[in-house]
Amino acid sequence: TLIHRLGLFRVVLFFSIEPLLDTLLGELRVRGLGTFHLDGIWPGVTDGPWASLLIYLIVFDFVNYLLHRAQHQWNWWWALHAVHHAQRQMTQWTDNRNHVLDDVLHAVIWVGVAQMLGIAPSQFVAIVAITQLFENFQHANVRVSFGTWGERLWVSPRFHRLHHAIGLGHERHPKEGDKPAVLGGHNFGVLLPWWDVMFGTANFDHHFEATGIRDQVEEGRDYGKGFWSQQRLGMKRLMQALGLTSAS
């Protein structure tokens, strides 16, 4: 839990592979091949420390949005991500309740994108810290809204709670009779709700819904009561989603 809260997976992985990539990029420069730095697209403007930090923050938030949608759309990834959504009582620690493999996959993609974009190590650490700080706040069990306009600029606890709502955050259309629920969900944005607005996944309703996963309530499915049982059951669901084992 503490490892996730501090973003240590991403930070350690970033600094672990940086020497290897520095060597590789050095070889490319020797061969006359340039390297890409996103903050260099407008010299004198985008390469300033604050401007580049803002650019990278927006880019990585978009990456987070895409990853978050994948966690819900792909059954094998949802099998792991469900650990995060299975907590019925939202708290600031809910953000840190994850399957370890889910965290590792997320970190690997983040670091891969960071290295491709050429972000400075100090800015990578800053973006990880900013993201973790606000994610913790968004999971707090408080009725906090930023108002009509503020909700469309920055993700609030109310906006994110709808993402955790039973039959809403993971399902675009709820189950009706014998008709199964349609996966899709709402409010995947991590810091910025812009992406949800752009891609039609935003829900700005002022409801304060119960949180969790539908089959916890309707079928009593067990997602684990402690860390080790959550990890074990997550791997079991993953194997089933990949067709490697049968449901029992």
Task: Give the positions of each predicted feature.
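Cytosolic-facing loops and C-terminal tails of multi-pass membrane proteins
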Residues: 197, 207-248
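Membrane-embedded catalytic scaffold of the fatty acid hydroxylase/desaturase
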Residues: 2-211
